[in-house]
A protein has these predicted regions:
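Conserved beta-strand signature within the Rossmann-like core of class I S-adenosyl-L-methionine
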Residues: 140-148
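Conserved SAM-binding loop of SAM-dependent methyltransferases across substrates and taxa
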Residues: 51-63
Length: 511
């Protein structure tokens, strides 16, 4: 392995994922729910941006100036391609952390984000990042950091260690990481078949291994097979970040803000008896067996008064991004599946059903006559946002300014969808971030952009693209061989797209 990789998997690219938690706009809802002042973000940085999908969607869909690095030049090259296509001005580099963090041309940042990368890097790189946060995060600025944590990883970490040891020692010379992963997974199967005491003491391990076997190999390579891989207790994370002068603010997982769906009454009572915030978080991790944390930290957190908090919450704009009829009145959290009250959620969803952004003050006016209190409205928005049905919306003026760059990026992405399904997201200047749009939907949008008006025309366009490349639709695990079967499936999907998805994409300024 070449020295520049520093033990990090580099012979296979990371997935083309989008992570909404990296959207600085989300900070507002989380911080206001926690009673904290949320910064206005003008400059942002992502360290270890992978393929750069999140960084580019956020840069193109907002007026925030984005900077970032990923030391894999192939990934950085793709990220730079997207930045050039959008004209967002995002500054995306292929520097090492040490080189990037010492660049003299970087501004100070309102927001710095790291998704997952903390768990996969060396202590030396962690020290570089902590020093960077100390120097470059503004007072009042927010750090988003997600990482593998304990105790949730304590059961499977030993097998992960064995997988990487096997890949490093038993993999044939000259074979790629995918072949080494397959060999390691096969060996783990053989091991568990011998019924070792380890798996008998940890009965969830075989099921977890089966889950791994079904996952994308690019994902597994980066998540599990780096030389450095360190799940970390929350208290250890707090010690690492202390020199950066940041303190824990709140969870970036919005559902974590609602104790009633995560903790039983006894657990809630125990946590209330713990005065120390860090110990409280540590104990909570044991209660929910936390495996992956998504946290916001702040440099100089400030509490809002109850009046300031209520006023700021009422100014938030939100938009429904799921068809009203498709929103289930159930949500899954640490305690399992919880039901949502029709009396509360029904009026809130009805008020948002046209997919137009509305402030919480407007929603309060629209639902108060139906017996919904502001506290209930606030929690409903929080849970709906955490479940992925509602997103925060930018001011109309900001959305208007971002429209040109988001349109350019989307045009580039839907054109690329002709040849690949790699990037399943497009930019929304309404939400300031990405929105899931699969390959076929992107091809339908491409057909519309070329003048096709009807769903049947979109389906024919998509089929022409697929057929020219010898591609077929996979339905229920099997390829559709006949052209008429492929076209029939595409027509059905195009009609559903026209009825359900297109109105939302128009409301989000994606279409």
């Amino acid at each position: 392995m070449s020295d520049w990789t520093a033990g990090y998997v580099a012979d296979i690219g990371y997935t083309f994922g989008y992570y909404t938690e990296l959207n600085p706009l989300r900070v507002k809802l989380a911080f206001l729910d926690a009673g904290l002042v949320a910064p206005d973000v003008g400059t942002a940085c992502e360290l270890g941006f992978g393929q750069g999908v999140s960084a580019n969607l956020h840069a193109a869909a907002s007026v925030v100036s984005w900077h970032g690095t990923d030391f894999n030049p192939s990934q950085a090259g793709f990220a730079q391609e997207l930045a050039a296509a959008s004209g967002s001005g995002a500054h995306l580099h292929d520097d090492t952390f040490a080189d990037f963090c010492s660049r003299p041309d970087l501004p100070d940042f309102d927001y710095i984000g790291l998704h997952g990368i903390w768990s996969w890097i060396s202590d030396a790189n962690r020290a570089v990042i902590v020093d960077f946060i100390r120097r470059k995060l503004k007072v009042g600025g927010v750090l988003y950091i997600s990482y593998n944590t304990l105790p949730g990883w304590s059961t499977f970490a030993p097998l992960r260690h064995l997988l990487t040891q096997h890949a490093g020692t038993m993999g044939a010379n000259g074979t790629g990481i995918v072949q080494r992963i397959e060999g390691a997974l096969g060996f783990a199967d053989r091991l568990l078949a011998t019924q070792p005491l380890y798996s008998r003491a940890n009965p969830s391990v075989p099921e977890r291994l089966n889950t791994l076997k079904g996952q994308n190999r690019n994902y597994l390579a980066h998540e599990y097979f780096n030389a450095d891989w360190h799940p970390m207790y929350f208290a250890d994370m707090a010690r690492w970040l202390a020199p950066a002068k940041v303190g824990y603010a709140c969870s970036a997982n919005l559902l974590d803000h609602v104790d009633a769906i995560n903790l039983n009454a006894e657990q809630q009572a125990l946590l209330k008896d713990i005065p120390d915030a860090q110990l409280r978080q540590s104990v909570r991790d044991y209660m929910v067996n936390q495996q992956f944390r998504k946290d916001y930290w702040v440099k100089g957190g400030r509490q809002l008064s109850a009046l300031e908090q209520a006023e700021a919450l009422r100014l938030l704009r939100v938009v429904l991004t799921t068809p009203r009829a498709d929103v289930p009145l159930k949500v899954t959290a640490a305690l399992g599946e919880a039901s949502m009250s029709e009396a509360v959620y029904g009026p809130v969803l009805d008020a948002l059903a046209d997919h137009k952004p509305r402030t919480l003050a407007q929603l309060e006016q629209m639902t108060s006559g139906k017996g919904v209190t502001f506290a209930q409205l606030n929690q409903a928005v929080l849970i709906l946002a955490g479940a992925g049905h509602v997103q925060l919306a930018q001011d109309e003026q900001v959305a208007g300014k971002a429209r040109k760059s988001s349109d350019r990026l989307n045009a580039h992405l839907i054109n690329k969808a002709r040849g690949s399904a790699d990037v399943g997201y497009l930019a929304s200047p309404v939400t300031g971030g990405g929105f899931t749009v699969d390959r076929f939907a992107q091809l339908f949008l491409l057909a519309r952009s070329q003048g096709a008006k009807q769903p049947a025309e979109w389906a024919q366009f998509a089929w022409n693209v697929l057929a020219a490349q010898g591609q077929r639709i996979i339905k229920e695990g099997k390829p559709l061989d006949a052209a008429e079967d492929n076209l029939a499936e595409l027509r059905a999907q195009a009609q559903t797209f026209a009825d359900k998805r297109l109105p939302i994409l128009k409301a989000l300024m994606v279409a």
